[in-house]
Amino acid sequence: MAKVLIKKLNPNVELPVYKTSGASGMDLMAFLEEPIKISPNSSYLVPTGLSMAFSEDYEVQIRPRSGLAAKKNITVLNTPGTIDSDYRGEIKIILFNHGKEDFIINNKDRVAQMILTPVIKMEFEETDNLPDTLRGEGGFGSTGK
């Protein structure tokens, strides 16, 4: 288990928890002074009232909650959202309403999930040629349905 420092930006904020022993992520809750409305085809930057610090070997990914996506057409717009190890500001979630009805978020509603994942840094080696593959440059549906 990796150590993550977490800071409540308000004493009324509740900390995220794993809901089951097999859960990969923890639900993040909205921290709001009053309910907000996300209209269809609109987004909103939802505050959580939390900030964190963790090792540079990791990132926190912000992902949609499957229930909100399946039942209400609400998703995290930049899925997965990345929280870098050197970011110390408030964690905020860009929610988007793909549905046809207004979506209301109340204080402490669970709106997304966060997952701690390892980061493997890249080292580039510039080249004029890449190794051939059977697929080649085919993309965007080139392998069939």
Which residue ranges define each predicted feature?
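DUTPase catalytic domain/fold
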Residues: 1-145
